[in-house]
């Protein structure tokens, strides 16, 4: 499989070439801006003064002054932070560059049969008769970058590729010609200042033109060889006319193909949840029905006019080969990049609303299914009710503390002490209601008079899903119960979505563990599950019955109240109405939007598969080896006393399907011996695959991010796809970053931040210098730069005004009083900060903060000399300090063996994993394993953050006592905690979690490597000198990551030794007390917490 080899110079060099490419006309001057260490501050001031003398300065004069500066300041004492471009005259007009591509290869718009008008890619004025009807909602790419920029970036990428890979450049050029020609034919869609495409631009162009240009360019950027070229070509051409079903059609054969690889050796999960190699060998087998399904899918593709893709699928189907399976996986991943399918909500929910109810169902099965749900819920909650769990007793407080800032369904104008705010946010409504004594936990009706407003969720290759936006009372009613159920699911392996510690690798080892030639793996996609109408009545009724049984287990009034409102929420939703096109329409199904959606679906899904398997047991003799539910999907392995034959498999599959249909559940049930495909991952031939389907030039919905933030998202998405086997041109990605991070100052003046800003961990970080690994620049220069950057604080007047308002103050006070017996400053600060942070999702506040930060950054990038440094200790300081007493002793070449558990990973990562081994569990990065956290959890609904826990255990014994006392922790427990000096253990545990957090061990590739691998003992030579376990831990972890980084960057394994004395350890330990975390758009997008 082709991996694109990055012949990547430096970002700064690339950016310079890009600017020359864009500003390809006479009247341009470039000015480089530098940052230098404090002792050369004067030289920078001098340089800036000398070039700002006259009005218009020539390039030669700038260059001359720059040379003087560079001669005076040594290279290690300075770095380039930005380029300022003065461009007089016409911008390197994209349209002029496109002209040379002609119109010969242009595509033509044509309506599709059976598609709604707006889903056709036809001339906009044929869909919307006039301006007043027009909306861009169904084609809006929702990203702050334009078709022009994307074309510019693609043309530049091609011109760069011609220098080192002429053959592939020709492929890209051929594909780009189709796009350029089509743009020449219809005209370039020009966006307004908010990157929206308006009626004037679109009226005489095909409606989906902009979205098509974006997704096509994205697909071109993925082309690395003939195979990817052919896929991209076919999808680009076909997606111009088919805007509805293409992705679904192209990806549906996959379900059958995953079952067609034999297993020849695989990794399995052992009893102690580790992966080990097993040399089991299983031949594949598929039923006649599956083969027919496959041929049917291929026929549909050909009817749609596709050639290469169906031919390739069919050829592979006739002679399956593990070595070419990654090519099949590529088609599967590519299909998502045709973009989102955005439907009108009325069309999206039409199916769900018009579900026909059948009385002709198997009542026996229904009864069993219903009882299973009821018993499961009863079992989960029983002990918690008997022991009067804090979360149930204080259900209301618990819910208020974790009240999200999602929409409450109605727009209100709220006056926060003079600051007027128009918002739909739940948290703001609650604060306001409590202040005005309008707050109540009574569940409002959702009947024909108060229908539920709908939100939307768009996914490539599927229909748009509707989301209920319920009043916050529903959240309060369901929160505690749902949390308890989720916690229970964390300990039950059947719930693979929630099972704790498990990452996807573990779930994979679970499947391969039980497979053999006597076993059938059945997997079912229950995607219509939510909409199946009677299923819902039955679900809600079972929940209510379980709740009524639970109520008899306790006399606690508060818990009775909690159960009552929970039951009320179920009864209301059982017969709910939704608001579509200003009409209220009856709808009884489960819809996402409730707190319990995910966990209830899983519980019901498990009950469903158990019921169906139970019914099958009356026909066959088999053992159920495992059952797993994961969201909409369920899969199970059943072992027979005899070897599976094609006849048995076929019979079994059709029986499985018929039992599902006896319950009138519309599902796609399949069975195989060696592989399965569910929404999140697929297993084939004993190997694990993920779909690389994250869109890069399209977003699902518009949010309040600036283009700068979106550049960070773009990079993070590129990394996710690369780790899943879809490599995009890195040149293209860096070019997009260069465009999207640039800041327009005036019409003629643009500022481009450079790598030293964009790749340094500060609030402005966007990408990593080396893909897959995080580098923390550590030199005196970069630490000074980082300190200056961290002094740029984001402020928001609106947020400050709200925080000062009587409403906000009294709300925080209320939470405080309800939580603690006597006011504890640490807790009240924690609450106030959390509540204030929730305000950030309110658009005007987020915008105000970012704008403020950017305007300061712009002046910094032009003249860094006037800025004060902030004295903060960051992870860089720590690593800089450690770098002083370690040395690299030797390095050997990383062995060529690759770990093939996940064949689609980049080769260098597979080699690294083969050497160090795969990680099967996550590290505690929240401090939840510490005793202090556990004690508070037992007696209170408050969850302190890691910073707060850290602060507490480092305080005096009396302060710790006071902290516990304010949560009503019994004296006996506190005494035990203090007398056994548990806080010393906690210091270590919490700091450990904090360090894991700081070093981002759950980022990208790091989450795959076993950081506790015994291999590291050979490469980190460290004999600790002092009794400072935290410092030792910090050094060890930092060096392990250093070794991994080196493997990825250089393909070498280094051996590092530590030469520290006692004072070094103590100094490091003290430093660790004060380390602060850095948040940036980069970290927001790249860290996977849970």
From Swiss-Prot:
Top EC group: transferase
Every RdRp catalytic domain range: 506-678
Keywords in alphabetical order: Magnesium, Nucleotide-binding, Nucleotidyltransferase, RNA-binding, RNA-directed RNA polymerase, Transferase, Viral RNA replication, Virion
Cofactor: Mg(2+)
EC code(s) of this entry: 2.7.7.48
Isomerase found in the keyword field: no
Major subcellular site: virion
Keyword RNA-binding attached: yes
SUPFAM superfamilies, A to Z: DNA/RNA polymerases
A GO molecular-function descriptor: RNA binding
Annotated localization: Virion
Cellular component terms (Gene Ontology): virion component
GO biological process: DNA-templated transcription; viral genome replication
Catalytically driven reaction(s): RNA(n) + a ribonucleoside 5'-triphosphate = RNA(n+1) + diphosphate
Record note on quaternary structure: Interacts with VP3 (Potential). Interacts with VP2; this interaction activates VP1. Interacts with NSP5; this interaction is probably necessary for the formation of functional virus factories. Interacts with NSP2; this interaction is weak.
Its biological purpose: RNA-directed RNA polymerase that is involved in both transcription and genome replication. Together with VP3 capping enzyme, forms an enzyme complex positioned near the channels situated at each of the five-fold vertices of the core. Following infection, the outermost layer of the virus is lost, leaving a double-layered particle (DLP) made up of the core and VP6 shell. VP1 then catalyzes the transcription of fully conservative plus-strand genomic RNAs that are extruded through the DLP's channels into the cytoplasm where they function as mRNAs for translation of viral proteins.
Family assignment from sequence similarity: Belongs to the reoviridae RNA-directed RNA polymerase family.
Protein name: RNA-directed RNA polymerase
The organism of origin for this protein: Rotavirus C (isolate RVC/Human/United Kingdom/Bristol/1989) (RV-C)
Top-level taxonomy: Viruses, Riboviria, Orthornavirae, Duplornaviricota, Resentoviricetes
